[in-house]
Curated annotation (Swiss-Prot):
The gene is obg. Its EC number is 3.6.5.-. It holds the Pfam family GTP1_OBG. It comes from the Bacteria. This is GTPase Obg.
């Protein structure tokens, strides 16, 4: 199951307690203090991992604790430090304060680490209180509590290309053809109920990562349909591809769909309208596609190097689209997230 938002409580380990102990050796009746300090509590550390694509692991784990430190011992033995709790999250995860919504950290790079909750300090044993004027202290201190944070993890997919379109526009078929993914494809709305992330392997060992988000409908920016839950997944993409159904399904036209898609994306985040984009007219193998394509070209002045006519089912026009995607991505400087 794809999970892209969770709220959890993270608790660092408590420091171990210091102890009161005395040297007990033969012929040394007053051996002096020998109580050791407590160990440090384990910290909670989050680490980005490219091998993870969802927050599903956290779905039924709402409270997570690091190990507490061990208590000190006699003969000045220090307690064992608690083991740090290292939690793996996907690249593209935002770490937020659950109450205020403030972003604490943004995980972008693989193996990137962030210490969120520091473990508690170990308490002092009576040996540490010994001074020249106080040779037999009979006191010790407890370890301090570890830090606690109530946080929200929110995943925004990191991809080179984001596919944007109405339900049934053919996004899943296109990403299946381009990236070889086995995604659910059928002729009814919202077949894609979660984002799909695939990649195209290029000849120079480079990859183009493609994100297919569930279909956008009118009112998505106001959380209609699947709405805001998935619109955020296109925020990190470097290139948008608008997939338009040229067959005129459900009485809609490519002109209508393109206008609504631009309006919804602009209402959600106006900066996305400044993102480089390509327009793809899909299903050119259908009977009514020529008239709808002609109408679209009349309504919108889109240059020929940004407009592609394809059949995702039959693979027509896909090679030209891949070449243009590669070219546009090589021209575009990396976006600051």
């Amino acid at each position: 199951m794809f999970v892209d938002r969770v709220i959890i409580e993270l608790i660092a380990g408590k420091g171990g307690n210091g102890v009161v102990a005395w040297r007990r050796e033969k012929y040394i009746p007053k051996g002096g203090p020998a109580g050791g300090n407590g160990g440090r509590g384990g910290s909670v550390i989050l680490e980005a991992d490219t091998q993870i694509s969802s927050l599903d692991w956290f779905r039924h784990r709402r409270i997570l604790k690091a190990q507490s430190g061990g208590d000190g011992g006699g003969n000045c033995r220090q307690g064992k430090n608690g083991t740090d709790l290292i939690l793996k999250v996907p690249c593209g995860t935002l770490l937020k304060d659950a109450k205020s919504g403030k972003v604490i950290h943004d995980f972008v790079e693989d193996k990137e680490r962030f210490v969120l909750c520091k473990g508690g300090r170990g308490g002092r044993g009576n040996d540490s209180f010994k001074t020249p004027t106080h040779q037999a202290p009979n006191i010790c201190t407890e370890g301090t509590l570890g830090e606690i944070h109530h946080i929200e993890l929110e995943l925004k997919l990191i991809a080179d290309v984001g596919l944007v379109g109405f339900p049934n526009a053919g996004k899943s078929t296109l990403i299946s053809s381009l990236a070889g993914l086995r995604v659910k494809v059928a002729a009814y709305p919202f077949t894609t109920l979660q984002p799909n992330l695939g990649f195209i392997e290029l000849d120079n060992y480079k990859r183009i990562y493609i994100a297919d988000i569930p279909g956008i409908i009118e009112g998505a920016s106001h959380n209609r349909g699947l709405g805001l839950e998935f619109l955020r997944h296109i925020e990190r993409t470097k290139l948008l591809i608008f997939i338009l159904d040229a067959s005129g399904i459900d009485g809609r036209t490519p002109s209508h769909d393109f206008r609504i898609l631009r309006e919804e994306i602009g209402a959600y985040n106006p900066e996305l309208l400044e993102r480089p984009y390509l327009v793809v007219l899909n299903k050119i193998d259908t009977e009514d596609s020529p008239s709808h394509i002609q109408e679209f070209e009349k309504n919108f002045s889109i240059s020929s190097d940004m407009l592609f006519k394809i059949s995702a089912v039959y693979g027509e026009g896909l090679q030209e689209l891949i070449e243009k995607m590669t070219q546009r991505l090589s021209q575009k400087k990396e976006i600051e997230y």
